[in-house]
Amino acid sequence: VFFPQKSQVQHFTVYRKLFLDVAANSHSRGVANISQTSSISEQSIHRKVGFAKKHQYTLALLVILAIFGAAALYNLGYMSVQWDEMPHLYGAVMLTHGQTWDYMKTYGYYPPVFDLITTGYFQIFGATQVAGRLVAVTFSLLAIAVLFAFAKKTYGAKNALIACVLLGTMPGFFWLTRVTMLETMLIFFFTLVMFVFYSWITKDTYKTLIFSGLALGIGVLAKYQIIVAAIAMLLSILFLCRNRLKISLAKFLAILLIVVLVAVPWFVMVYQYNGATKFQTLQYVMTEGGQDRPAYSNRFQPIPIFYLIEMTWPFNDIPVNPISLPILVLGLCGLGLFAYRRKKQDIFFLTWFMVVYVFFTLIPNRQWRYVTTLFPILAVSAACFIMFLYSRVRLWKPKQAGLKGSRQKKLAAAFFIVIIASLVAYASYDTYKMTARDQIHIPIQEATDYLAGHLDQNQSAVVVCSFNLLSEDMFRFYLPYSMSRDQIWQYPDLPVDSFKPNFNITEFLNLCQERNVKYIILFDWGPHTTFFNTTLDYAQVQTMIYDTHRFGDPQDQPFFGDFANNKGYRLFLVRFLG
C-alpha cells in the first residue's frame, strides 16, 4: 500500500515525460503564435504607412475638399437670393411642377443642364434656395478634383495640390460656390475639356477623342460661353501637333461633329418654343446686358486691360477682388514662365489663357464672371511659379560653407514657405470679405407666406422698384403651387439699379386697379439712394404713392425684418384702398 510496485513507477515516469513534452510544445507554439501575430501587426502598420505615403497628396486633397465644402455649406441659406439666381431656382420649380411650356417660354434662352440638375436636387432635398445652391457647391468640389487630376498629370502632385489650394481660396470662386449660378459648372466642364483634350493630344486614343467631344457638347448645354474652348482646341492642334497636323485636324472635325450631335437638339427645341425671340434675348444678354453695362464694360478702353484689372478690383465700395492681387501676380508670372520654358504643357495652358482673354475682351459686354474659366489656369500657373521659386531657393548655395551655410539655406526655405502661406492666408481673408459683403437677409419668404394666406385668387401684390435683391420671381419662388404666378408682379418692369426707371404714378394706379392689387410691397433700403442714371430715389417714389391718399390702412400694415446697422432690410406690405 505504501510502496508502489516497479511497474507503477515506470508508468508514472512515462506519463510525466509525456506531460512535460506537451507543455513544452504548447509553450513553443504560443511563443510562435505571439511572434506571428506581432509580425502580422507590423506588416499591417507598414502597409498602412506605405499606402499613406503613396497616396499622401490624394489624402491631402480630400482634406482640402472637406475644409472647402464645410466652409461653403456654412449658413448657406442665409444670404438673400440674387437676381441672377432666379432663372435657375424658379425655372427648376417650373420643371418640378411639369410646367415645361412656361419654363421654355420664360427661361428657354438659358442652357438646360444646370436647371435639370437643380430640378433633381429639388426632388431630393425640396424646392429651397439651399438645395439650388448645393448644385453650385457640388460642381465647385468637382472642379477642384478635376483640376488636381489635370495638374498632377501635367506638372506633378505637389503643383496640383498647391493649385487646388489657390483655386479654393480665390474670392470669386468661393463666392460663386454659394449662389445658384452657372459659373461653377462652367469651370468644371472647361477644366474637364482641357484635361481630356490634352490627354487626346498626348495619347491620341479614340476614347479620349470621343470623351473630348462629349465633354464639350455637354459643356455647351451647361454654359454657352464654353464654345470658346473650340478655338483653343484648334490652336493647340496647330501648335502642338505639327507632325500629324492633317490627321489631327480631321479628328478635330470628329470632335466638333460630336458637339453638334449633342447640342443641336436643344437649340431646335428652343426654336420651336418661340425660338427667334429667345435667340434675340441671348444675343442681347451676350452683347449688351443692362443699361449699366456699357459704361462699366468700356472702362480702360481702348487698352485691352479690362480683365487684368477686373479680376482683382471690380467693386467700388470696398476693396474686394475675385482673385487676390498677390495670387494674380503669381499667376501672371507663371504664364511668363510658361512663355519662357515653352514645354508642351506650358504652351497648352498659355494658349487656352490667351484665347479666353482675347475672346471675351472683344465682346462688348464685360464682367469678371465671364472669364472665370481663367481661374483654374491662373491657379496652375501660380502653383508652377511658386514651385519654380522654391526650387531656386533649394538650389541656392550660401557663400559660407558648412553648418552655418546649411542653416542659412534652411532659414531661406522656411522664410519662403512662410511668405507663400501668408499670401494664401491673405487670399482667404479676401474670400471672407467678399462673402461677408453679401450676407444680407431680406425676409422675402416670410412676406410671401403672409401673402399666400391673405390673397384671394383674384387678388395680387406688386413689388415696387425691383432691384438685384428684390424681384417678382423671388416671391413667386416661395408661392404655393396652388397660387398663380400672375398674383405677384413688379413695377417698373425692369430693375431700377440697372435700367433708368420711368415711374409714372398714374400708370401705376391704373395697373393696381386692373390687377386688383391688395398690397404693394415696399423695401426699406436707403431712402435717398438714387436709381440708375437718374436723380429719382426711393423716398420720392414713396412720396408720390402716399400723396395719392389711396394707399395705407392703419389696421392692416404688416412688415417683416429688422432694422440693423443703420440700414434696414425690412419689407412693408401697404394696403391699396382702390
Where are these regions (language model features)?
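Membrane-interface transmembrane helices that cradle and orient dolichyl/undecaprenyl
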Residues: 152-154, 158, 193-209, 219, ...
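Short acidic/glycine- and proline-prone juxtamembrane loop motifs at membrane-interface regions
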Residues: 82-83, 136, 172-185, 367
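Short periplasmic/luminal acceptor-recognition loop of GT-C membrane glycosyltransferases, typified by
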Residues: 451-491, 495, 518-528, 572-573
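Transmembrane alpha-helix segments characteristic
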Residues: 62-69, 191, 216, 232-234, ...
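Transmembrane-helix motifs of polytopic, lipid-linked glycan transferases
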Residues: 66, 134-155, 192, 196, ...
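Transmembrane alpha-helical segments
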Residues: 412-442, 484-489
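Transmembrane-lumen/periplasm boundary regions of multi-pass, lipid-linked membrane glycan transferases
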Residues: 75, 88-91, 218, 227-341, ...
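Aromatic/acidic, Gly/Pro-rich catalytic loop(s) in extracytoplasmic/lumenal soluble domains
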Residues: 382, 506-578
